[in-house]
Amino acid sequence: MAFDKDAIIASLKEASILDLADLVKAIEDEFGVSAAAPVAAAGAAGDDAAAKDSFDVELTEPGQAKIGVIKAVRDATGLGLKESKDLVDGAPSVIKKDLNESDANDLKSKLEAAGATVALK
């Protein structure tokens, strides 16, 4: 049997809306498909991460080399020795807030190089 799309289109033009709805239902049943338009999930998790433009750098664990981490925190924040030590001892604690992605990753790298465990939030 040859497929004549022009004849099918001509038949569809002459059909009523009710006939076309029945045709769609029959095609769905016959082939196990749906004519409904797919709906995308709003606000997928990947989209939130991509849209984020400011990050908080959180020290989650100072690690074994606490003195090096205190120095890195002091350099990054401009805080005094006691304040920097208090931040490190109080881990988990936010070291800096609202940094752009590049600055946040730089600070994270410096803290990790000093031996700390760091998370970007």
Curated annotation (Swiss-Prot):
Keywords: Ribonucleoprotein, Ribosomal protein
Gene3D superfamilies tied to this protein: 3.30.1390.10, Single helix bin
Tagged with keyword Ribonucleoprotein: yes
Transmembrane segments: none
GO BP terms in the entry: translation
GO terms under cellular component: cytosolic large ribosomal subunit
SUPFAM superfamilies xrefs: ClpS-like (SSF54736), Ribosomal protein L7/12, oligomerisation (N-terminal) domain (SSF48300)
Its job: Forms part of the ribosomal stalk which helps the ribosome interact with GTP-bound translation factors. Is thus essential for accurate translation.
Classification via NCBIfam families: L12 (TIGR00855)
Sequence similarity: Belongs to the bacterial ribosomal protein bL12 family.
Full protein name: Large ribosomal subunit protein bL12
Native source organism of the sequence: Oenococcus oeni (strain ATCC BAA-331 / PSU-1)
Gene symbol of the encoding locus: rplL
